[in-house]
Amino acid sequence: MKQREPGRRKSDHTNVKDQYDEVQRDGRYEEGMARMAVYHRHCQDPVIFKVLGDVRGKSLLDLACGDGFYTRRFRSLCGASPVMGIDLSPKQIERAQMIERQQPLGIEYRVGDVTALALDRHFEVVTAIHLLHYLENATEIELVLRKIYGVLDHRGRFVTMIANPEFDFARHDAADSKSKFAYYFSRAEPGNGGLMRFHPGGFDKERELTVEFRRWERHVLDRIADDVGFTPEWHDPFISAEGLERYGASFFDNYLANPQSKLLCLSKLIEPRNKP
């Protein structure tokens, strides 16, 4: 299939910022995250924390951190330190900072656009639970990966969840996904840069959230990562032992056969092969 370089919808990503500001302001973000607890705990968390590994005492930067849902866990459960979270949405960061004041963990939060990432420090680990699929083209992906490469310490790692390159919309059971995991897709164009329309939170139609992002094919991301100076490694999601015991293996059959996301771990080489 011919590769296509989709045009930007809004080059400064104000659409994404405005949307996440709105859902944080009206409470749907927090409510939706709570509704998706089964998915997060049993489908997404296991692969994230397995690949993240032992980060006790390691500096960690969490990009696209939202209200700090994972940022706090990387600090409190995994022992990463120091920890910083950055997000494009001021309202998300306001919420993260409020929680930090109420339950201090020593996390620093900042509003920022990863495409203009500029920090005066380095980190041993960079995470981004959902980021790359919000970018609009290969040029932007390369820019962001170079920014991340620049803030990583020697042989640091970038751990990120990304829209599944092999997701098959024809096999997607929307009703099953919504009833069990509080999300579904209403659109997923095939091919590199194909638009995906995602509805998280399990809301009724009148309150439904609609999030659009793009799928990027595996070989495209691998090539860009390699050009920047990363070694890419893909990981499939798997179900937690607790989830299997509580719900049974068949409960997760549809999800595992066609998961919404996969994990990409990029390990930094000593020097980038092709500097910009």
Regions found by a protein language model. Give the residues of each.
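A short SAM/SAH-binding and catalytic strip from SAM-dependent methyltransferases
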Residues: 124-139
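Conserved class I S-adenosyl-L-methionine
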Residues: 2-55, 69-73
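SAM-dependent methyltransferase
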Residues: 159-223
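A short acidic, Gly/Pro-enriched loop at the edge of an enzyme's catalytic core
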Residues: 115-126
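Class I SAM-dependent methyltransferase SAM/SAH-binding core
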Residues: 61, 67-116
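C-terminal lobe and adjacent flexible extensions of AdoMet/dcAdoMet transferase-like proteins
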Residues: 220, 224-276
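Residues at the starts of beta-strands that form the adenosine-phosphate
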Residues: 59, 82, 157, 231
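A short glycine-rich, Lys/Arg-flanked "PGG" loop and its adjoining helix->strand segment in the class I
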Residues: 142-154
